[in-house]
């Protein structure tokens, strides 16, 4: 049991270690700049950020340029966004919370790829960093996408344990082998990076569940403690919910957690074929 706890806790410990390393790197960077005043102001980076305000519908969306001195900024894109909002433009709107790649709030499109701003390093080159909201979503404002329908689809798969045979000690036991089957699935943080990078989801988002939701569906389908496997598969037995996946695999390439939704979808298809 102790070894299992260590395995469960290790991802969280890893995040704290990474956070401390980033903080130390930032402090070292600022200290080096203070020790060498001539270097101040020489490491400027341009950010081109998508702006749109629903309160001003007559103004078309645009890319607005901001310049940040990287010697006085943390190493991540989110650090730059926070610095811009705090020091240059308080109207800039974006989501963020944990700053550790855990919550998924700061998902956006950076230089053409969906990712989390809090774990995306600022490129040390002369090219501007272009930042857009997640693609093919309605926009609330600036970098904030409307994920209402995404979460509605997630709710539709009933992502909770369904088992009416509650044990006397009120705990559902699971072997280590069965628990290991959930690795690579439960870590999904529902940031929507994968689904909004999928062309099939762009074209069929009203009916196709998309990579993130389907991976979560598979996570519950194979959970040895769950008794609703047949029902879960039956709900998706149509031409759209699952089979609009054409294995383009953008989902696996863009996942900031290194997961493989495409593989999970393939396994769902295999189960449906034999159900």
Swiss-Prot record:
Its main location: mitochondrion. Pathway: Carbohydrate metabolism; tricarboxylic acid cycle; fumarate from succinate (eukaryal route): step 1/1. It is an enzyme of class 1 (oxidoreductase). [2Fe-2S] cluster binds at residues 98, 103, 106, 118. [3Fe-4S] cluster binds at residues 198, 245, 251. The keyword Electron transport applies. Residues 1-24 form a transit peptide. The keyword Iron applies. It is found in: Mitochondrion inner membrane. Binds 1 [2Fe-2S] cluster. Binds 1 [3Fe-4S] cluster. One of its GO terms (cellular component) is mitochondrial membrane. Its cofactor is [2Fe-2S] cluster; [3Fe-4S] cluster; [4Fe-4S] cluster. Residues 178-208 form the 4Fe-4S ferredoxin-type domain. It catalyses: a quinone + succinate = fumarate + a quinol. It is a peripheral membrane protein. Residues 57-137 form the 2Fe-2S ferredoxin-type domain. Component of complex II composed of four subunits: a flavoprotein (FP), an iron-sulfur protein (IP), and a cytochrome b composed of a large and a small subunit. Iron-sulfur protein (IP) subunit of succinate dehydrogenase (SDH) that is involved in complex II of the mitochondrial electron transport chain and is responsible for transferring electrons from succinate to ubiquinone (coenzyme Q). Belongs to the succinate dehydrogenase/fumarate reductase iron-sulfur protein family. This is Succinate dehydrogenase [ubiquinone] iron-sulfur subunit, mitochondrial. It comes from Schizosaccharomyces pombe (strain 972 / ATCC 24843). The gene is sdh2.
């Amino acid at each position: 049991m102790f070894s299992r706890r260590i395995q469960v806790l290790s991802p969280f410990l890893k995040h704290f270690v990474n956070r401390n390393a980033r903080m130390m790197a930032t402090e070292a960077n600022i200290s080096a700049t203070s020790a060498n005043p001539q270097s101040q102001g020489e490491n400027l980076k341009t950010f081109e950020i998508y702006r749109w305000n629903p309160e001003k519908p007559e103004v078309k969306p645009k890319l607005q340029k901001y310049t940040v001195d990287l010697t006085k900024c943390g190493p991540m894109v989110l650090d730059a966004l926070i610095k811009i909002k705090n020091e240059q433009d308080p109207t800039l709107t974006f989501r963020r919370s944990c700053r550790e790649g855990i919550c998924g709030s700061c998902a956006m499109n950076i230089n053409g790829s969906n990712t989390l701003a809090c774990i995306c390093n600022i490129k040390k080159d002369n090219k501007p960093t272009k930042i857009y909201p997640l693609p093919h979503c309605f926009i609330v404002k600036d970098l904030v996408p409307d994920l209402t329908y995404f979460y509605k689809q997630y709710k539709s798969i009933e992502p909770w344990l369904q088992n009416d045979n509650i044990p006397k000690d009120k705990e559902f036991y699971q072997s280590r082998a069965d628990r290991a089957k959930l690795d690579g699935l439960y870590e999904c943080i529902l940031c929507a990076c994968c689904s909004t990078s999928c062309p099939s989801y762009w074209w069929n988002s009203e009916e196709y569940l998309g990579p993130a939701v389907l991976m979560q569906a598979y996570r519950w389908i194979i959970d040895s403690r769950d008794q609703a496997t047949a029902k879960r598969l039956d709900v998706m037995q149509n031409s759209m919910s699952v089979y609009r996946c054409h294995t383009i695999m953008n989902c696996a390439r863009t996942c900031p957690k290194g997961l493989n939704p495409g593989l999970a979808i393939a396994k769902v298809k295999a189960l449906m074929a034999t159900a």
